[in-house]
From Swiss-Prot:
Record Pfam families: CTP_transf_like
Name of the protein in its database record: FAD synthase
Catalytic class of the enzyme: transferase
Classification via NCBIfam families: cyt_tran_rel
PANTHER family: FAD SYNTHASE (PTHR43793:SF1)
Organism: Methanosphaera stadtmanae (strain ATCC 43021 / DSM 3091 / JCM 11832 / MCB-3)
A molecular function GO annotation: ATP binding
């Protein structure tokens, strides 16, 4: 099981999800929990893309078998329901794997937690870098006004 914001999809997301699925072996089912809009706003910034659309986009990515919007009241709800063998933490996520594992054990869930550290660097390897690049780009306003 992987989780994240997935606001503006970029190659780093694909790498994270691909590495997450590999950990499960040949017949792995990759489940992804997409952060709610409120969670994103509280921990990062206001999301550009809404949670339902982000979840649908993630569900379309290669290797993803199931995608869910997280639960605002209980962040462990989907984990308790689906009981994955492994939970992966992305390279940009500030969770301590040992702390998360201990929290899971307290809830009666003995789930392996793995931090995905290897991260292929791309010029635009984060949503923030993409947003910054868009802000710096001199767009033809006529084109943007006619965008549908």
């Amino acid at each position: 099981m992987a989780s994240g914001t997935f606001d503006i999809i970029h190659p780093g997301h694909g790498f994270y999800l691909s590495e997450s699925k590999k950990l499960g072996g040949d017949n792995a089912i990759l489940m992804v929990v997409v952060a709610t809009d409120k969670t994103v706003k509280n921990h990062k910034r206001v999301p550009i893309v809404g949670e339902k659309q982000r979840c649908e986009m993630v569900s379309m990515l290669k290797g993803v078998d199931e995608a869910y919007v997280g639960d605002e009241k209980d962040p462990f709800k989907i984990v308790k329901e689906k009981k994955p063998d492994i939970i992966t933490i992305g390279p940009d996520q500030n969770f301590n794997p040992d702390s998360l594992h201990k929290s899971l054990l307290k809830k009666g869930l003995d789930i392996k937690v793995v931090k995905i550290n290897d991260y292929k660097k791309f010029e635009l390897d984060s949503s923030c870098k993409i947003i910054r690049k868009i802000k710096q780009t001199d767009f033809d306003m006529d084109y943007l006004e006619n965008c549908q």
